[in-house]
Amino acid sequence: MVKGSQVKPSTTELLLKAVSAKAPSGDPIHQKIGDLPFEKIVEIAIEKKPDLLAKTLKAAVKTILGSARSIGVTVDGKDPKEVTRQVDEGVYDAVLAKYEEKWEEAEG
């Protein structure tokens, strides 16, 4: 490790912290550990930009939604798979547009 560098938290760690959970769900399809607003998912995507292969904010958000689903976190009270479908349908375009500048400014 380079002196002075910090280890960045993983996506899972950021999601767990956001829902105040200690561990992922052992059965994420049936047992949920918390719920986050869509905007928190967007903020995590921006924070993780340097570590993601996603070229767009929308793609990064979909990556974070996949991680949320795999650990038992819902988004706006819905399964992240449903939210991903809504992202593709343009339901969240206005929210994403609001964060586009922050995405562009983020390192990555």
Swiss-Prot record:
It comes from the Archaea. SMART domains: RL11. GO terms for molecular function: large ribosomal subunit rRNA binding; structural constituent of ribosome. Pfam families: Ribosomal_L11 (PF00298). One of its GO terms (biological process) is translation. Forms part of the ribosomal stalk which helps the ribosome interact with GTP-bound translation factors. Part of the ribosomal stalk of the 50S ribosomal subunit. Interacts with L10 and the large rRNA to form the base of the stalk. L10 forms an elongated spine to which L12 dimers bind in a sequential fashion forming a multimeric L10(L12)X complex. This is Large ribosomal subunit protein uL11. The lineage of its organism: Archaea, Thermoproteota, Thermoprotei, Desulfurococcales, Desulfurococcaceae.
